[in-house]
């Protein structure tokens, strides 16, 4: 049975197009027997924003404040959750050409030297290996493969850095470019999702 971690990151609640697609994917994969865990980073599972104190604490050490210890434990939980699943599905709506702050914050919690990646004599090496990632990205305009898409290239870079190089992408484009474009973008994205196996 495939174990799947779904990360939602939209802050739009019931108006979120990425959430519609993610829910479609979850329903599709549940019929295939996947065990799904959902973390709603833009909603009920929002994380504390990583600041200087937290960032310092995530490096570990003997003299951590109570807050740093709590945030380090949270990071350990997020990393364990990441490593415990076979497939990571990331809902990545485009906000001002890039990912939501809530998703970037999750990345800051899990990207830890010696934990999810390490540095070697030949360069960095990811420690989260043997995983698959699926990116579901929604955007109001048409940005795929263009210079204004700072969502997919960035996420592929981060995932590759921690060892996840098997990455598939579902695009829902031009969602704010009129009703027909919206319906076409969502329909094509759902069709792409229907082709994915858990």
From Swiss-Prot:
What Pfam family is a match, any one? Flavodoxin_2
Please list the residues that bind FMN.
Answer: 10, 16-18, 94-97, 138-141
The protein here is known as FMN-dependent NADH:quinone oxidoreductase
Role this protein plays: Quinone reductase that provides resistance to thiol-specific stress caused by electrophilic quinones.
PANTHER family per the UniProt record, alphabetical: FMN-DEPENDENT NADH-AZOREDUCTASE 1 (PTHR43741), FMN-DEPENDENT NADH:QUINONE OXIDOREDUCTASE (PTHR43741:SF2)
What reactions does this protein catalyze? 2 a quinone + NADH + H(+) = 2 a 1,4-benzosemiquinone + NAD(+); N,N-dimethyl-1,4-phenylenediamine + anthranilate + 2 NAD(+) = 2-(4-dimethylaminophenyl)diazenylbenzoate + 2 NADH + 2 H(+)
Q: Superkingdom of the source?
A: Bacteria
Cofactor annotation remark: Binds 1 FMN per subunit.
Protein source organism: Shewanella baltica (strain OS223)
Q: Which GO terms describe its molecular function?
A: electron transfer activity; FMN binding; oxidoreductase activity, acting on NAD(P)H as acceptor; oxidoreductase activity, acting on NAD(P)H, quinone or similar compound as acceptor
């Amino acid at each position: 049975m495939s174990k799947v971690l779904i990360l939602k990151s939209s802050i739009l609640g019931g108006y979120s197009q990425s959430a519609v697609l993610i829910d479609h994917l979850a329903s599709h994969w549940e019929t295939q027997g996947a065990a799904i865990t959902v973390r709603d980073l833009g909603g009920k599972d929002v994380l504390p924003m990583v600041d200087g104190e937290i960032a310092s604490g995530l490096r570990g050490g003997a003299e951590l404040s109570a807050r740093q210890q709590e945030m380090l434990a949270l990071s350990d939980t997020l990393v364990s959750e990441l490593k415990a699943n076979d497939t990571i599905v990331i809902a990545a709506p485009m906000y001002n050409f890039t990912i939501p702050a809530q998703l970037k914050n999750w990345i800051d919690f899990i990207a830890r030297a010696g934990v999810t990646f390490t540095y070697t004599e030949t360069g960095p090496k990811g420690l989260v290996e043997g995983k698959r990632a699926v990116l579901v990205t929604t955007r109001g305009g048409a940005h795929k493969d263009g210079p204004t898409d700072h969502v997919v290239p960035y996420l592929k870079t981060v995932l590759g850095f921690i060892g996840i190089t098997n990455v598939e992408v579902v695009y829902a484009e031009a969602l704010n470019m009129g009703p027909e474009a919206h319906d076409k973008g969502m329909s094509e994205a759902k069709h792409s999702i229907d082709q994915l196996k858990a």
